[in-house]
């Protein structure tokens, strides 16, 4: 990490090596800026198919949209690429992965985001999923919501408990 910092290459892509993080990455940007309205849905579907293929076989998939779960007001806008669709989360889950997704906290009460997550958990496509949520409470507030497969739930709960008991514990709270 020091080498990356000292080189001036402080970009996420610099961390995407097995020497630093033993993980699979799909970092293809979904951009609608020059895409006509009628073509956005197909472009998104193609992008998502590539993401599914790249992440097939992963036990945990972390989804990091700019804003979080899709809201109705953004679904048809050029900014729809800043959100993840529930169907996309369900696809990763059905592929065998537990899913963690990022949610930026905008000007809504906590209950709005909890309700969104609970609504996902009620969907029959992930009926066996266990939900978990972490709220980052420092600076800009954000959530990390979990859709856990039964075979991963206990291990992830233990890891979250360890995080909360450690030096980062004061920065998070369970939702």
State what each model feature region is.
Residues 1-175:
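Class I S-adenosyl-L-methionine-dependent methyltransferase catalytic core
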């Amino acid at each position: 990490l020091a080498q990356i910092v000292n080189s001036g290459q402080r970009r996420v892509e610099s961390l995407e090596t097995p020497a630093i993080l033993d993980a699979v990455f799909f970092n293809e940007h979904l951009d609608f800026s020059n895409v006509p309205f009628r073509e956005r849905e197909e472009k998104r579907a193609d992008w998502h198919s590539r993401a599914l293929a790249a992440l097939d076989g992963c036990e945990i998939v972390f989804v990091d949209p700019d804003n979080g779960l899709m809201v109705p007001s953004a679904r048809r806008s050029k900014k729809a690429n800043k959100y993840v669709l529930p169907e996309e989360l369900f696809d990763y889950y059905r592929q065998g992965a537990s899913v963690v997704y990022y949610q930026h906290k905008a000007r809504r009460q906590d209950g709005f985001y909890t309700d969104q997550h609970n609504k996902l958990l009620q969907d029959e496509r992930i009926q066996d999923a266990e939900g978990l949520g972490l709220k980052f409470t420092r600076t800009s507030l954000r959530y990390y919501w979990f859709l856990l497969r039964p075979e991963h739930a206990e291990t992830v709960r233990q890891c979250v408990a360890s995080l909360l008991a450690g030096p980062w514990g004061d920065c998070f709270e369970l939702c």
